[in-house]
Amino acid sequence: MELLQGDCMELLPEIPEKSVDMVLCDLPYGTTDCKWDHVLPMETLWREYRRVLKPNGAAALFAAQPFTTALIGSNRKEFRYCWYWKKNYKTGAPFARVQPMRCIEDICVFYRKKPTYNPQGLVKLDKPIYKAPDPTSIYQMRGNGSIQLYTNYPHHLLEFDGVAMGPNRKHPTQKPVPLLEYLVKTYTNPGDTVLDNCMGSGSTGVACIRTGRRFIGIEKDLQFFQVAQNRLEEESGKDNLVAGQVE
């Protein structure tokens, strides 16, 4: 595990080429007045993501409108689809009289070549099902059909409780570890390396520890970095996880 404190745009070039299997990051959306909430230079960020990711690596990036549209537009060629995280709470109460409250965040998935994809929650069928080609379907199968061995394939709506206010909430936009574990297990295998270049309080790192993945985390804010460092040291049982620091 590597934890780096400093500006990710300065530290990303230090990460070796083609060394990362997945980027999982909650980028700044640029929709609040928080001092850290400024959209990163996307052209430069994508150049670094392409460099550090393996050819079949995936980037799963949290977003919400209007940032979602800007994020997809920043790399339309490699954008593939979105997951939609349905929270157990709503936001936007101050504007409830003029617009609907929100309970969804987007997770935009990008890749160049087909990545690792491990559908979660599959149930093996007692008896395989053969599906013959259907000439009336707009989705034509190649060859003579297919055999279905599993059911309960995931759809794009993911329902996970958010992190409630209290001692377990370390960051204002903290994401739930079970959701991050789900994404890590979907796009990587045990022993793979996951990068979070805006790690906040380190939730992605916790997910990686619990699922047996390697983790590289970068955080600019020193206070949040120290929270993440302490949290990950406690989770892993190891001290001195810091690999470098940029003033």
Question: Where do the protein language model's features map onto the residues?
Answer:
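Core catalytic lobe of class I
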Residues: 1-218, 223-226
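Short functional hotspots where side chains directly engage DNA or cofactors
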Residues: 227, 231
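S-adenosyl-L-methionine
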Residues: 1-12, 235-247
